[in-house]
Regions:
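Positively charged, low-complexity nucleic-acid-binding target-recognition regions
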Residues: 1, 131-232
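Substrate-contacting helices/loops that form the catalytic groove of nucleic-acid
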Residues: 1-126, 208-232
């Protein structure tokens, strides 16, 4: 248990809550730290509308690139400020380490701005928020680690059983023997990620009607030291 003395701070990323951070032992969500992403999402929507209008007007490439670059830089400043707030929150704990999902999506702003079926979160916002959080943590001297992302938004942080999401924002544990009933889904996910940092923490998920034995998804927490890439 080489990292048992570290305080893992799980950070869940989303559009409504850009960052939700919590250590595994936080007694309730009032001690977690959340940064709302709604304004950034609205600005990304505006930027897409702006590019659509420029393309419709037949604006030249230089004009479009200059417009996008200026607004993108403003968005990155906002995301960096949010990431800094998360790092300050984490640094208040003893021997903190930030724990995020092991995802490798690369941000692609042009996909969001021009592809008809693009999704702003997966195309740009979430990969960017992930990379910037790790970059800012690096600047702050805060250690980072990633853990497997599978089921992290569905698993109960307390008992490990897969629950459900009755309204998207709420997580509900379906295990009748668990003390968790319902709670904020993002807060639950942050705690699941923090929990996975420690050795031996495996997902307890069993398919409800499965007859196979001994092959649950093994989600052994792992640490990685990854150098960071700046978003384009
Ligand atoms: Zn539970």
């Amino acid at each position: 248990m080489h990292n048992a003395d570290r305080t893992a701070i799980g950070v869940d990323l989303g559009e409504y809550n850009l960052y939700t951070a919590s250590p595994v032992k936080m007694p309730d969500s009032s001690g977690a730290h959340t940064i709302c992403g709604e304004e950034i999402c609205a600005r990304l929507d505006e930027l897409r509308d702006r590019v659509t209008a420029l393309l419709y007007e037949g604006a030249d490439r230089e004009t479009i690139v200059a417009s996008v670059t200026r607004r993108r830089d403003g968005l990155l400043e906002e995301i960096d400020a949010a990431a800094r707030e998360i790092c300050e929150y984490a640094n208040a704990y003893d021997r903190p380490v930030l724990v995020t999902e092991d995802s490798h999506y690369q941000p692609d702003l042009w996909t969001w701005l021009t592809a008809p079926n693009a999704h702003r979160g997966t195309a740009w916002l979430l990969p960017t928020a992930h990379l910037r959080l790790r970059a800012v943590a690096d600047e702050c001297g805060l250690e980072v680690a990633t853990v497997p992302e599978a089921y992290s938004s569905q698993e109960c942080h307390a008992c490990g059983v897969i629950g459900d999401r009755p309204d998207g924002e709420t997580f509900r544990c379906t295990n009748p023997h668990c003390h968790v009933e319902t709670l904020c889904a993002d807060y639950n996910a942050a705690k699941v990620l923090a929990r996975r940092y420690y050795p031996g923490r495996r997902c307890a998920y069993r398919p409800p009607h499965s007859v196979s034995r001994g092959e649950p998804p093994t989600l052994v927490a792992e640490r990685r030291s990854q150098r960071l890439q700046r978003p384009p």
